[in-house]
Every structure is written in structure tokens, then in C-alpha cells.
Amino acid sequence: MISGEQTPTQYIQHHLQNWTVGEGFWAVNVDTIFWSVLLGVLFLWSFRRVAKKSSAGVPGKWQCFVEMIVEFVDNSVKESFHGKDKLIAPLALTIFVWIFLMNLMDLIPVDWLPTAAMYGGYWLGFVEDPHDVYMKVVPTTDLNTTFALSLSVFALIIIYSIKYKGVKGFAKEMTFTPFNHWALIPVNFVLESITLLAKPASLALRLFGNMYAGELIFILIAMIGFWQLPAHFAWAVFHILVITLQAFIFMMLTIVYLSMASSEH
């Protein structure tokens, strides 16, 4: 999209608008689903390809890179998850790589893919006005994505709590912590419920806030004309740290929360 065709406000709003089908509760952000699924498939395909071709001989560069990531995640799980569960390491690896890939889309110049989608839709006859086509390519700048991820973690927290503590143990934790007295059961339940619900909320909002702010800065940089290339590069170098850190934080907090849920005390 060429910023000169629109006012600055229209340009920013267009880039922050999802390709949405439907209305209200049944609205679906098609671009979010498309890019998140595509990146998930890319992750599975690339890692499976390495696993199938891995050998005891001299590994290639990509195999070394994948093995380094797997070892890093595996060590993180061993240090943070105080228990034995075969699901945690694959789950942590999936969370880290998938979120990293979704975040990484933020480094693509903001006009490239939306412009291709805009004029592609126009030339194919899907729309009469190219500006009626919207395309957000960073799934983690959509609250639907971050809350879907965090609510999945929340469901696992409940499942692991019941699995390791039993229904009775989980209920006791919710009603007799932190004050071990029957008269304070309502207070305990409210406090524990808030603590429990704060976990997925903080996971979702932290990831969304950091990525949304980063995307907005890239959009503002794209509006400054000739100097946008060096400015984009400078911000991208810094943003790589944010991208990686947010994926790592989400992974580590997931491991810690599940470790706490599986702890008997």
C-alpha cells in the first residue's frame, strides 16, 4: 500500500485492520488464521524433515541449528519443570518456535505483503477498490491469537492440577490457600481464582502489547519516506531481541505454571 494514496490516519488504520469475515461474536480474522496455520505447518515440516534425515554422520547447518534449539528448550524444561512428563518438552518447543515465527513476520516491511494482497484482490476481481483488502501478517498482534494460546495453557494448568492433585486436592488448594481456615474459604476462593485467571491474561496481554507496539512503530517508520530503510533496519535489529524474548518468556512461564500445577505442595 502506498502511503501517498491515503492520509496518515487512514494509512495506519488500514494496516491495523484485519481481514475479517462475519460480524460480532462470529467474526473471523482470516489473515490471522492463514498466517498462524501456515507458520505452524512450516515449523512442523522443517523440524520433521530434519528428524527424518538426521544421522550420526556430519550434520548440516540446518540440522545443527534445529538441534541447538531443541537442546536449549530441553535444558530449559529440565531446569524449570520439577517433575517427569513427556508432554512438557514438545509443548515448550512448539510454543517457542511457533510464537517466534509469528513474531518474526513483524520484520517484513509493512507494505510488501499487504500491497501484494491489496492489488492481487483487485486484479482478480474480488474487490472494486484495492483499499477494501486488509492483510495483517503478524498473528501475535491479534488479541484472538494471544488469548487462544494463553487459554490453551490455562486449560493445561487445570488439567495438570487435577491430574497430579486430584479433584479433592485441587478443590482444597482453591479453598484453603493461603488461609487454612474454613471461615475464610470464600476469601481464599476469590484470591486463588484471581491468581489463576491472571496467568492466562498476563500471558496474552504481554505478548500482544509488545508485538502490537512494535508493529505500530514499523508502520510509523514506513511513513517517513526516503529515511524509512535505514530506520527500519535499525529498529529491526533491536526488535529481533523483543521477538525472541517474548517467545522465550511465554515458553518459560508456561513451563513454570505447569510445574506449579503438577506440584503436590
Curated annotation (Swiss-Prot):
Q: Which UniProt keywords apply?
A: ATP synthesis, Cell inner membrane, Cell membrane, CF(0), Hydrogen ion transport, Ion transport, Membrane, Transmembrane, Transmembrane helix, Transport
Its domain of life? Bacteria
Q: What is its main location?
A: membrane
**Pfam families in alphabetical order:** ATP-synt_A
Entry's Gene Ontology BP terms: proton motive force-driven plasma membrane ATP synthesis
| Topological type in the membrane | Multi-pass membrane protein
Q: Any keyword Isomerase?
A: no
Task: Indicate the transmembrane segments per the record.
Answer: 25-45, 88-108, 142-162, 207-227, 233-253
Question: Where is it located?
Answer: Cell inner membrane
Gene Ontology CC: plasma membrane; proton-transporting ATP synthase complex
Q: Name one GO molecular function term.
A: proton-transporting ATP synthase activity, rotational mechanism
Subunit record text: F-type ATPases have 2 components, CF(1) - the catalytic core - and CF(0) - the membrane proton channel. CF(1) has five subunits: alpha(3), beta(3), gamma(1), delta(1), epsilon(1). CF(0) has three main subunits: a(1), b(2) and c(9-12). The alpha and beta chains form an alternating ring which encloses part of the gamma chain. CF(1) is attached to CF(0) by a central stalk formed by the gamma and epsilon chains, while a peripheral stalk is formed by the delta and b chains.
What is stated as this protein's family in its record?
Belongs to the ATPase A chain family.
Function in brief: Key component of the proton channel; it plays a direct role in the translocation of protons across the membrane.
Query: Which protein is depicted?
Result: ATP synthase subunit a
Species assigned in the record = Idiomarina loihiensis (strain ATCC BAA-735 / DSM 15497 / L2-TR)
Tell me the name of the encoding gene: atpB
